[in-house]
Amino acid sequence: GKTTLLRTLLGLITQDRGEIVWLDDAGKYHNYRTFECLYQGHQLGIKNLLTVFENLNITKHAKGMSQEDIYKHLERVGLSNVNELASNISVGQRKRIAMAKWLLKEFKIYFIDEPFSALDDTATLLIEKLIKELNAKGCSFVITGHRPSGIEATRVEI
């Protein structure tokens, strides 16, 4: 249900009934594709045969970004083993690569499926901090999960 909801909101799955209406700040209708959004599902998009650095560097939002900036984003999420193959790192470290992708560009809306699963307390606190920082800059989050976190909704829409 939770993953299906996110995928339906993004148009990746067609709903059987009802409609999804996206409105901008002025109340004008838009297609979800007109909003700059990031979707992170269960599959993190991490390539096993690439290094930690290469996994971030190959994303479309890293194009034109200096290596130094990419290293800073990896460092910000606690990854210093940038030359390690992704096949040799833990699930938690793979999720940190995914978190670094959040930092490449400030998206209007982040759709994140189960960001807290398989993480230790340190990584959980890091995600909470990143979400709060990005939210303070005007970014919105739609998050699914099984376990509660230290993040409180600032606005709930039904």
Each language-model region and where it sits:
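Helix-to-loop junction immediately C-terminal to a conserved catalytic motif
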Residues: L10
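Hydrophobic anchor residue at the start of the ABC signature
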Residues: M99
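Conserved ABC ATPase "signature" region
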Residues: Q67-V82
